[in-house]
Amino acid sequence: MTSSLPVRAPSWVSSRRIFEERLQDLPKCANLNQVKQLHAQIIRRNLHEDLHIAPKLISALSLCRQTNLAVRVFNQVQEPNVHLCNSLIRAHAQNSQPYQAFFVFSEMQRFGLFADNFTYPFLLKACSGQSWLPVVKMMHNHIEKLGLSSDIYVPNALIDCYSRCGGLGVRDAMKLFEKMSERDTVSWNSMLGGLVKAGELRDARRLFDEMPQRDLISWNTMLDGYARCREMSKAFELFEKMPERNTVSWSTMVMGYSKAGDMEMARVMFDKMPLPAKNVVTWTIIIAGYAEKGLLKEADRLVDQMVASGLKFDAAAVISILAACTESGLLSLGMRIHSILKRSNLGSNAYVLNALLDMYAKCGNLKKAFDVFNDIPKKDLVSWNTMLHGLGVHGHGKEAIELFSRMRREGIRPDKVTFIAVLCSCNHAGLIDEGIDYFYSMEKVYDLVPQVEHYGCLVDLLGRVGRLKEAIKVVQTMPMEPNVVIWGALLGACRMHNEVDIAKEVLDNLVKLDPCDPGNYSLLSNIYAAAEDWEGVADIRSKMKSMGVEKPSGASSVELEDGIHEFTVFDKSHPKSDQIYQMLGSLIEPPDPGELVAVR
């Protein structure tokens, strides 16, 4: 019996096989270095004009968010076909570049190529928002004329696109849906999603009940609709009926209860969630929920549990939790997340660092904010604006103006948000003339047209120092209608300088815009009281009563070791309210004369 030695294939055969295998996987590759290496091999083999390979390369570059490179690949092909054009249109659509997608479409027509049943769905993916509705309608007409609506993929894309164009778009989507001779699950789900996004829950539920066949997407979409509108009893009822559930189902319930302020039920749902369904997203939802409510102990405990489970925070999780800390002022949890970041590879992520900077700045820890700001290797405009705003609102106006000067020296061009921060800083620092100069420099120097927010800052700036005539002139000559913020700033200035007559006129304008805001009436009442015009005070209170406007109770909050505690006037909901009122009483009572000690 003889045995033969295995025949070894030449090296060029194995390298070609590897190359072909990589080409097969290319459209799914999101590693830019690997894509670039393969692109270099394609050019070396003179395959860059291959109409089978070029679309794959464009798809891979799209996943890597490198549309400029994708355009270069497209331009290297002398005679593109419809498939190649569709690939580039899709790449622009995936990367939120609608105008570039339509430019490729116009180039396609210049080449004499006809759109197919993939071209329009890719173009429709690029359109989103009410302003795109006329364009979508125009494409709908083209689709009908070309006879492409017989392919169910095309009307499904139209329904999805119409649904992203606001309430009017949803109506057009419904008209198309009702006309369709054939519908699949995607058609039903797209229409259901559109109704849910538009807040049309009754119509959405009717459609859901009519569905001939529901999949998990159908159930989750309807569940999300109830959760978004805080209708958690209906959401729970639907959740209980679900034939199957996944991570999205459980997360929607936890998020819904959390947003509705019912952290007890949010925790019940989280604890009931099967272990395989718990991922970074679900942990983030529950931690951020507790953080938003200022419940430090529970949030801290859950952070410990998540770390112990072996899961690691990703950028999205950190940003969400930091945003919740910012909203509630829960600085200690934000600092805890910061310490975790130092031990992870997220410490250099620009989005994470900006979120951390925002949290410290808004919570008033400006030293930490500056430390984070200085640690950001490549500061973008968001970093500068956040630091400027933090300094401005916390009374460090001069430091903010110095930072603005440094920003300009470093060649960073300010935007409209920058100038809101700068004007607020001038306001807090009493830099009136400088603030006026900055306001007028917006258009003269930076070609930025001031918006209503900037005019509001200018009115507040002038009003604070008693230059009310100038402030009124600004309001009268501004190019847009003054809003509640503008009139509110003027009313605040009237109170500061006891300008009763002007305040009456200002309130009349405020009432036209917002008749139910008790703060405006209270402010005018205080102005009358300061001027000892008690008839005016009585008149305002009478007006409030006749209109059913009630002044909300004043509230204050304090962060202690276990979280944030809030107190309102005559509130007895706190578990230790008896002890609190007893201590408050002892503080109010005058001390015993015998206990007084003379201070020399």
UniProtKB/Swiss-Prot annotation:
Gene designation per UniProt: PCMP-E27
Start and end residues of each stretch annotated as Type E motif: 486-561
Top-rank taxon, per record: Eukaryota
Keywords for this protein: Repeat
One MF annotation (Gene Ontology) recorded for this entry: mRNA binding
Family designation: Belongs to the PPR family. PCMP-E subfamily.
Swiss-Prot/TrEMBL GO biological process terms: RNA modification
Region entry Type E(+) motif, spans: 562-592
Protein name as it appears in the record: Pentatricopeptide repeat-containing protein At3g29230
The keyword Nucleotide-binding is annotated on this UniProt entry: no
PPR repeats: 50-80, 81-115, 116-150, 151-183, 184-218, 219-245, 246-276, 279-313, 314-348, 349-379, 380-414, 415-445, 451-481
Signal peptide: none
Gene3D superfamilies per record: Tetratricopeptide repeat domain
Species: Arabidopsis thaliana
Pfam families: E_motif, Eplus_motif, PPR, PPR_2
Transmembrane segments: none
